[in-house]
A protein has these predicted regions:
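Charged, compositionally biased N-terminal leader segments and the immediate start
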Residues: 1-27, 292-293
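Small-residue-rich anion-binding loops in enzyme active sites
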Residues: 26-105, 177-206
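Well-ordered mid-protein domain cores that form the structural environment of catalytic cofactors
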Residues: 96-150
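Active-site nucleophile and cofactor-binding loops and adjacent substrate-binding regions
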Residues: 105-107, 131-139, 187, 213-221, ...
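Active-site-proximal loop->helix
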Residues: 142-184, 276-288
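Domain-scale recognition of functional cores that engage charged ligands
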Residues: 195-199, 207-258, 262
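Short beta-alpha connecting loops at secondary-structure transitions
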Residues: 290-298
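Single conserved hydrophobic/aromatic residue that forms the stacking wall/gate
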Residues: 302-321
Length: 321
């Protein structure tokens, strides 16, 4: 049985059922699975299934306890067409994996649609109503809202930095008129939104369960690992991947897949002027700075100066490997 432990050494481990609805660990660390219990993922590239069934197979490979949650669920009901990613040629040696065919045109639909469905099912089991708290630089918020807006067991509060996301993303979030959806514009940066969310998640002041759908939640990683397994399935030789990176959740998912057998050589994180990730990979030191404005507002997801997800890869010095 896979157990989940904190990156900061908290001794108590939790189960898959607990990690579904988890935020931060009691010591404010991020949860990680005991990787020794996870099989090599490369053999899954031989599966010939629909993308949704393929993702279910990967979830079960990552944790067999997920089977009772994914087997009879529609993980991609929000997609108008197949959720299978699309590959387009850029030139003779480079392809683009298109992950913008979901309901919000964000790659985060691919992980949040399954997570929303699984979290709703788990809350129904418990007879509880949960509160999802999300900090967003634009894309997570709209994708999270779409994932849970029809939920019978979830309310969602989204924190976004005022005037620092694209107008398209703002309209996506604020035009959803549902009794369980709440949007709050924060006077500050995404890092400020993330700080507020982490403080609430680590010291819950409310008398109800608070859930994170940010990549703090391990199931987000599982959903993202799934499309890297699918991607390597399309090639006979190892590949390199280049990923626009802000909080490092997506790039970490590629690294996790590689560390569990996927044929990925280089993982290249691309940043803008907020280059804390570049400095981290160059020096091994994670040194947050003040967020600087960029000329690419549509890429607000990389306007981040205090990424928290590198903590998973730094755990135990694993970033060196």
């Amino acid at each position: 049985m896979v157990k989940y432990q904190s990156t900061r050494g908290h001794k108590e481990t939790i189960s898959f059922e607990d990690v579904i609805l988890s935020g931060l660990a009691p010591d404010k660390g991020l949860y990680l699975p005991d990787s020794l219990t996870i099989d090599n993922l490369n053999h899954l590239t031989e599966e010939d299934l629909s993308y949704e069934d393929f993702v279910k197979t990967i979830f079960i490979a990552l944790d067999k306890n997920s089977a009772k949650y994914v087997d009879d669920l529609s993980l991609y009901s929000g997609f108008e067409h197949s959720a299978e990613p699309v590959l387009k040629d850029l030139n003779d040696t480079t392809l683009i994996m298109e992950l913008f065919h979901g309901p919000t045109k964000s790659f985060k639909d691919y992980a949040l649609q399954p997570l929303g469905a699984i979290a709703d099912k788990r809350l129904s089991e418990l007879g509880e109503r949960g509160l999802v708290l999300v900090a967003t630089s634009g894309d997570t918020g709209s994708a999270a809202i779409q994932a849970v807006k029809e939920s019978e067991n979830i309310d969602i509060v989204v924190l976004h930095p005022a005037d620092k996301i694209s107008d398209y993303q703002r309209q996506q979030m604020t035009s959803v008129i549902k009794d369980n959806v709440f949007n709050i514009a924060v006077n500050g940066s995404y890092d400020d939104c993330q700080r507020i969310a982490k403080e609430i998640l680590s010291d819950n002041p409310f008398e109800r369960r608070i859930i994170s759908l940010n990549s703090i939640n391990w199931l987000r990683v599982m959903g993202q690992v799934s499309y890297y397994v699918w991607l390597t399935k399309q090639f006979t030789s190892p590949i390199n991947v280049a990923i626009p990176s802000g909080n490092f959740g997506n790039a970490y998912s590629a690294w996790f897949g590689r560390s569990h057998g996927l044929k990925i050589n280089q993982i290249m994180c691309t940043t803008n002027v907020n280059d804390v990730l570049k400095r981290f990979t160059d020096t091994g030191t994670l040194e947050p700075l003040i967020t600087k404005p960029s000329v690419a507002p549509s890429l607000s997801l990389i306007h981040i100066s205090e990424p928290t997800r590198p903590e998973r890869i730094a755990y135990g010095g694993l970033w060196l490997k």
